[in-house]
Amino acid sequence: MPEPARKPVKEPEEPAGTPIKEHFQLKETIVTIAACDRKYIEAAKDAIRTHRAVLETYILSDPYFQITLEPYECPENAPEVVRRMIKAGNTIGIGPMSAVAGTISALAVEAMVKAGAKYAIVDNGGDIALINDRPVVVGIYSGQSPIRNLGLVFEPRDSITGVCTSAGTVGPSISFGMADAAAVFSDDVSLADAAATALGNEVGTGKEAVEISFRAIRGIPGIKGALVIQGEYIGMWGDLPEITRADVRYEYITKA
């Protein structure tokens, strides 16, 4: 008697290609782009050029957009990059420029995915959007803090997520706090960027300051979790990726 036909078992799809990286600068936007094919890197660069030009044009029409630290009313005809920045800033209660780097990262990765990428990372000065078909370790740079060389393991996923970092002791970005690193995790990368800014602003010095800093973002829909490093103290809230050791050096950072 013949054996019944068996349904073929689909083998898990292997990640394709060895990742390549490219450093790309367009005026103040300085990014590191990672993908498995150069065409995806070009897609990211094209998106950055396009959305940055749109943003610059909008700022010329309303310079207040660039300088306000307060929530901003969204015009009906605002372009997508501007809308995302406004929505993120308003959700957190701060200005739209708090979300500029994360928004550009997200739009670039979206363009890479549209081109077919399953592995795509854009690091815009510590504000990172990614989609990955293999585990990825993202290092957290914490300046002179004794808590260093920490990495976060992002397991394979088929949708874009983000980790954005703010610091008061590292880098040129505006921060009113004393965090060596304040990182926020969200699938809304614009929101993660604005939230990291607010979290970093809230961090003072000492253990108690780290503990109470999370009030700046706790309870905001869309935020998965956060991590703060300040001096010899580290605090975590919410759902975080697995923490591991990583080789985190200053020269590895995409400086914006």
From Swiss-Prot:
Task: Show the InterPro entries listed in the entry.
Answer: ApbE-like_sf, MA1715-like, UPF0280
On the tree of life, the source organism's domain of life is Archaea
Signal peptide interval: none
For this chain, the family text in UniProt reads: Belongs to the UPF0280 family.
Q: What is this protein called?
A: UPF0280 protein MM_2648
Q: Which organism is it from?
A: Methanosarcina mazei (strain ATCC BAA-159 / DSM 3647 / Goe1 / Go1 / JCM 11833 / OCM 88)
